[in-house]
Amino acid sequence: MPSLLPLVLTFLSVSSPSWCQNSDIESLKASNGDSFPWNNMRLPEYMTPIHYDLMIHANLSTLTFWGKTEVEIIASRPTSTIIMHSHHLQISKATLRRGAGEMLSEEPLKVLEYPAHEQVALLAAQPLLAGSLYTVIIDYAANLSESFHGFYKSTYRTQEGEMRILAATQFEPTAARMAFPCFDEPALKASFSIKIKRDPRHLAISNMPLVKSVNVAEGLIEDHFDITVKMSTYLVAFIISDFKSVSKMTKSGVKVSVYAVPDKINQADYALDAAVTLLEFYEDYFNIPYPLPKQDLAAIPDFQSGAMENWGLTTYRESSLLYDKEKSSASSKLGITMIVSHELAHQWFGNLVTMEWWNDLWLNEGFAKFMEFVSVTVTHPELKVEDYFFGKCFNAMEVDALNSSHPVSTPVENPAQIREMFDDVSYEKGACILNMLRDYLSADTFKRGIVQYLQKYSYKNTKNEDLWNSMMHICPTDGTQTMDGFCSRSQHSSSTSHWRQEVVDVKTMMNTWTLQKGFPLITITVSGRNVHMKQEHYMKGSERFPETGYLWHVPLTFITSKSDSVQRFLLKTKTDVLILPEAVQWIKFNVGMNGYYIVHYADDGWASLSGLLKEAHTTISSNDRASLINNAFQLVSIEKLSIEKALDLTLYLKNETEIMPIFQALNELIPMYKLMEKRDMIEVETQFKDFLLKLLKDLIDKQTWTDEGSVSERMLRSQLLLLACVRNYQPCVQRAERYFREWKSSNGNMSIPIDVTLAVFAVGAQNTEGWDFLYSKYQSSLSSTEKSQIEFSLCTSKDPEKLQWLLDQSFKGEIIKTQEFPHILTLIGRNPVGYPLAWKFLRENWNKLVQKFELGSSSIAHMVMGTTDQFSTRARLEEVKGFFSSLKENGSQLRCVQQTIETIEENIRWMDKNFDKIRLWLQKEKPELL
């Protein structure tokens, strides 16, 4: 799950391996040289698991574990071959039993391994009978994984400096097979009975509550956990640790507990309260009780992603769950709430109802991302999360505007391709098209559809079309319910709304959004009362690629200078015309950025909107202002709007005070000078940075150095002061230096307002003494927010030796956890002094990085893009192409590689076309900035 990092932090600072898959090959060779009887990445459809009995015994001293898997299976046709998943497991013995009876043979089953497919074949002497129940018993052993997936080792240091070891699991998408032999595909659901053998000083937790503990030997306890509901293998979880916990009950009697290392359990209260509130919300919203007796949330010291939705035992990075009242930031509170909300939404979307295969991952992730906003808007209204939603859509559009993007629902087969699906298209675009559909249907109608979907498919698996079919019959026809929104609109037609009811064809409409990559650009041309609309596929660098000819069913919304009530129009064709009741001065489409499309206003349309922002910007909402800023710069990229007009539009920001338009402007403007940094254009680069400071100076000067205000006001303060200090704005730098001196003199004990800490630390890190002091404080800090603030600050150093040392240390993982490495590499990749070091480190350590973080993972994508996607010279482009093409099956075909190459090509083209125009624009007098 993507973490919520402030936008400015990031800026200041595919196919996969050639898995053997040729159906023409009669048989593959197993690792012992014998013929392997199955040549498909997917498991046979004729074998179904019913129930697993798992016994796991981990030794946290030798970092090994032993296991016994007993899995009940049924074959739909006679077969003597059982194909299962197994990866890095040493199978010592496999036997077969019919039903609950005796062994069929004293002779163990023959075991063949085919590591390239992560499969084993168990060969029975006699064919299994169709429709009969059998039990496969497998004994095996393995090392605890040194990566972040499978059954892996994690460590932490106590306040006294003692190193402690624990073992945790991360199975999604394809790593359950690293902990026990299994049928590791999401549609092969089964129930699980889990037993864990452990040392008496440790605690074991799993998906279900503990039933009993048995002393099986001196110094060895076996914990028996209750049988699970029917679920996919990737949702199984267990942890062996010395964690402490705090608990509360929901109104419906579900026990909610937060687990953490003993020194940090006092930071668990906020997440616990949020989890209880959110679980109660979801039970009510979905009208389906949470089906398990408990929900644990565990903070794992080493964790690659943000969090994981294992049923009944959700796992998190410490920074995604633990909240320190004294030191955690406003953005941390927002982030924790959203991530907990996301994982708890999965208990229904993903766990109760699961996609049939990973090509429809978005049914899990898009829904959970969308439900974050639906739930937290209600449960924590003070966070105002609805303001941040459209930012997710812009994130998705960044990658979805490239030719290398993919449809929301797209075929995948091997593990690396599956891992690549965990991207902004599955999460953010998935959420945005659901939000657009909700806006189209109305909140109540949409809710009826998804409740119907969840109830119909509970404990089952679904495809894309199953969701749309559930949305087809959602308007009540018997008059028993008050009709709202879409359903009431469907009863009468309107001359300005093409949403009148022939038949609600949600499926046809939504297939245009899930089965095609990209998104539409809508061009609006106003002529008197006539509004001409045209749609086309928005794609950067489209002149290099053939026309796609895609058409979408676009639910357009608009307001005008004459009416602020939202008007609606469903555009199904390439062009159409709507007629307004009267002529207008301006028209603004995509109200609130609820639609996943961008808009170009032809003729004098942009001039009218630019004038509106200049004269009376609060006439339209802050989200509408932010979307205008975004759309203007997106249009510059495809030469529909000049860079001068886009920059002119931003001049109104002198009077802006709201977080989202300012963040969106920074999102557009900061990358422009980052591209200049890579071309050694110091004079214009400096002028551009000065322009940005002048634009925001009044608002920067108004910021108090306190923690007062709403969450959005506090987040804005933190980012503006950081920007001012990093850009060397002296009033900010001098105050930050004073704070840092006092904080350092107190040996880090003095309390600094949380919202200004980032700016203070960034200034303090600019000399050797300050940098070293910050690093020493990092080692002893128990606060995730403070550690991330120090990490960021250390990465802003202009000393190449410090930056190189930081790369080496974070990769080793002794003091700075290796989980932080992708973020540190990216921050140094954004540093004007550090970016060559980051790019060099990525190349020299590629094989180790892939081993640790896995090919196709979002961490690998984050590092590839973070070190290269702001390059803007042909020399760097050739370097990038040369390096990745040399990798062959170890990364050359990754989607993130295609994305970064496209992005660099776009950067070069953009700079060649716009740099001189920017230089001249900066030289012109701007009365707005005086």
From Swiss-Prot:
Zn(2+) binds at H342, H346, E365. It is an enzyme of class 3 (hydrolase). Substrate binds at E172, G306, A307, M308, E309, N310. Binds 1 zinc ion per subunit. The active site is at E343. The keyword Phosphoprotein does not apply. It comes from the Eukaryota. Its main location: endoplasmic reticulum. InterPro entries: Aminopeptidase_N-like_N, Aminopeptidase_N-like_N_sf, ERAP1-like_C_dom, M1_APN-typ, Peptidase_M1, Peptidase_M1_aminopeptidases, Peptidase_M1_dom, Peptidase_M4/M1_CTD_sf. Disulfide bonds join C393-C432, C725-C732. GO terms for biological process: adaptive immune response; membrane protein ectodomain proteolysis; positive regulation of angiogenesis; proteolysis. The record marks Y427 as: Transition state stabilizer. Belongs to the peptidase M1 family. Aminopeptidase that plays a central role in peptide trimming, a step required for the generation of most HLA class I-binding peptides. Peptide trimming is essential to customize longer precursor peptides to fit them to the correct length required for presentation on MHC class I molecules. Strongly prefers substrates 9-16 residues long. Rapidly degrades 13-mer to a 9-mer and then stops. Preferentially hydrolyzes the residue Leu and peptides with a hydrophobic C-terminus, while it has weak activity toward peptides with charged C-terminus. May play a role in the inactivation of peptide hormones. Monomer. May also exist as a heterodimer; with ERAP2. Interacts with RBMX. This is Endoplasmic reticulum aminopeptidase 1. It comes from Mus musculus (Mouse).
